[in-house]
Amino acid sequence: MKADNLRILSENGFSVPKFQVVGPNEDIDFSHFETELFAVRSNDAHEDGGKFSYAGQFLTVLNVPKENVKKAVLAVADSYKIRYYEKSLGIKSENNNSSVIIQEMVKASYSGVIFTSNPKGILNDMVIVVGKGIGENVVGDKEETVTYHCYKEGASYKEGSDILFPEHFVKELEKLGNRIEKLFNKPMDIEFAIEDEKIYILQAREITSLDFDLPVRILDNSNIAESYPGVCKKLTRSFAKEVYTKIFTRLGRRALGKSVKYYEDLFPHMVCDFGGRMYYEISSWYDILRLLPLSSKIIPVWQKMLGVESEKITFSKEKPNIYIKSRLLFSFLYLMVVSQRKMRDLSTFFKKEFRYFDKKIEKEDDPKKLYFLFKEMEEIFFREWDLTLINDMVSFLSTYFAGDKVKKSLSLESKKPAEALNDLIYTYKRFGKESPKYRRKREKYIKYYGDRTVGELKLETRTFSTNPESLDKLVEEREKLPLKIKKGKYIYKRKSLARLSTNNREISRLNRSRLFGLMRKLIDKIALKTVGDDIYHLSLEQIRDMIFLGKEFSDEINEERNMLLIYENIPTIRRVELLGNPDIDFCDVQAIEEDGDERKDFLIGRGVSSGRVSGEIIKITDMRKVLLKDVKGKIIATYSTDPGWFLLLDVAKGILAERGSLLSHTAIVARELKKPAVVGIKGLMNQVQTGDIVDIDGNRGYCKIIKRS
């Protein structure tokens, strides 16, 4: 098998050192070899098979001079007698071929292994392990190694030793790995060596540790990154999973009745975390979307509206039967018809219950009673929150079919915080910070919009509600900029389904931010009586055990602190393909700097807000670290935005984002503010730098770099 694979590689143009296959008693023909030193390797009949690799089970002899090759061949053949590996794994070997491979020795400056899929079960993570010298020293842990993780969507990071490996080889090795995987049509384990700037393939075999009987789980953060940007603390991660489980369970029961039992195992897997970041477990969503009428048409629309880049679709469930499809068809049509009335009712219900719980939390200080209030809020609010998912689907479909008309939508709910802030700044300018008028308007702003900020669904996020002084600081900063006062005028707006559903979507998002703000307030009160800010390093289950059972979690808190530091060094990976539920280790992680020579001057994305402007780039990775005066009149380049960014977008000239879709917050606010916007630009943050001069076209969806800084 090993020799067969080498022949295939050689015949397909890969650089394979010259080799010859001989039996232990055969003569060796050295005439076509060009080196004086050789590697003598095993070629057992069962080696490098589909189920068992036999890695390291038989002898390999390196740096063998010509006169000693025959002796090395006999030694390698003799090692076939040892079959402990087969006995321990219950392998029945019938054909013990005793041939041996004689191969030209590569004088390697570096060598290593490429796993085209992470053997732990991450299918789109190519792992490249490199060390100095020959491969035997690397495999035998005799040399320091560095490990590169190269995701097929572009993100890369490394871990391990700081050996001086020329990193331009990483891209070349990645390309070779992809070519070899495509050639054999399966994940491969590839040994390589580098001599004089040339990469040689020494052997290639199938990765045997991957169990493809396990389900493939696809994680995607295309849209969820707006709500949960960056690394999230443990409490946020556990709460997000619980919320999605409750909401989808309720939606399933509403739409499917008793038939929901066939799909209940999916609901705890709607979202998950990976490397400290939140992801949609999109493979579960596909199973649920498959229930819808015309699902083959709806799923691509849904992918497009959420900004999902890969069109690959996988299902873990069998195709639903006609009864389930019929029931859901009628449920779906009914819910679409009543969706806007239901959304109005939900908003009224929310306001009433919000006032009730706000008063209860304000008066309560006992951690046990506060915890019960938290669980009661979950039950009350999320019991009907599945209606927002139905409205989202209505919004996706109606907006998609409305096309460019939706770009002209006016006066959406998400514009109100910006208008209220302008009013507050005007009051500050006219009456001063200590005036009763300013204090009243400040209190009102915090009441309604105090929790609308960057990362508002992350419970650890500090908002204007938790830190009111930060609002004063913002107002003082904005007061120094010219205030734009827009006179209101009556504009007739046809109440199309696209506009109604999109507006209700924004109302529900604002209500959601207020709800999470109330829960944040409750958690902060529990924290004051228990472990302080460390409460955010605990899961909901751990908080319960701490309050009611008196358990102590100092070790777990310290571990979580350390993991957060590691997570911060992992680049954002847009898509992850997992085989089953693998254990993933992240350690000693360093992001890989992209090669500047690969920059492009013309970047393509999706235009989501009309207009064309030229201007200077300001690159933002954390909006909390920039001042409004630094953004004014410039074009923002970022990974993604969320509702807290409207302050920056208001003073910016335009917006470019690596992620996003027509219905992302970036798009909605940009349209309201009439700022050109292009989203979904792959690799944007590696292509532009602060100070670059660019031309962006929000109609056609491109960014042209005119001058680099």
Question: Each predicted region: which residue ranges?
Answer:
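Extended active-site and interfacial segments that coordinate phosphate-rich ligands
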Residues: A3-D4, Q57-R83, K107, S111-D162, ...
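C-terminal accessory/binding modules appended to enzymatic or scaffolding proteins
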Residues: K480, K484-T502, G517-K521, E594-V651, ...
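N-terminal beta-alpha lobe that positions the nucleotide/phosphoryl donor
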Residues: M1-I101, Y110, D358-D366, G615
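Contiguous hydrophobic, helix-prone segments at protein termini
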Residues: E167, K182-M188, K198, C232-T236, ...
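Extended, hydrophobic alpha-helical segments in both membrane/secreted and soluble proteins
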Residues: N5, I190-F192, I224, W285, ...
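A long amphipathic alpha-helix within ATP-dependent nucleotide-binding catalytic cores
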Residues: E94-N96, S156-I194
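Structural motif
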Residues: L37-A39, L59, S99-V100, V113, ...
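Acidic, glycine-rich flexible loop/linker segments
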Residues: N137-V138, L173-L183, P187-M188, D196-F212, ...
